From Swiss-Prot:
Keyword Ribosomal protein: yes
Keyword presence, Plastid: no
Keywords on record: Ribonucleoprotein, Ribosomal protein
SUPFAM superfamilies: Ribosomal protein L29 (L29p) (SSF46561)
Encoding gene per record: rpl29
GO-annotated biological processes: translation
The name this protein goes by in its record: Large ribosomal subunit protein uL29
Family (UniProt): Belongs to the universal ribosomal protein uL29 family.
GO molecular function, one term: structural constituent of ribosome
Length: 77
């Protein structure tokens, strides 16, 4: 499913729509990985689940940073 790690600068370069789409893809992939783990007992790639979770967290963190930046800008004037 492509490269594993999304770098923060790659995420910041994405539009909000692209980030939401990527987040949706990652959540679907995480669900597939967890399902295969529950069926077979062992995931195909154990490190992949951890990396998917980290990528989801990176995207959510970037979204929150953007949200806080907009709030600060409106408070300043």
């Amino acid at each position: 499913m492509g490269k594993f790690k999304l770098r923060p600068d790659e995420i910041r370069e994405m539009t909000p729509e692209e980030r939401r789409e990527k987040l949706k893809e990652l959540k679907a992939e995480l669900l597939r990985e967890m399902t295969s783990k529950s069926i077979s007992g062992v995931p195909d790639n154990p490190g992949r689940v951890k990396e998917i979770k980290k990528n989801i967290a990176r995207i959510l963190t970037t979204e929150r940073e953007e949200e806080l930046r907009k709030i600060r800008e409106t408070e300043k004037g």
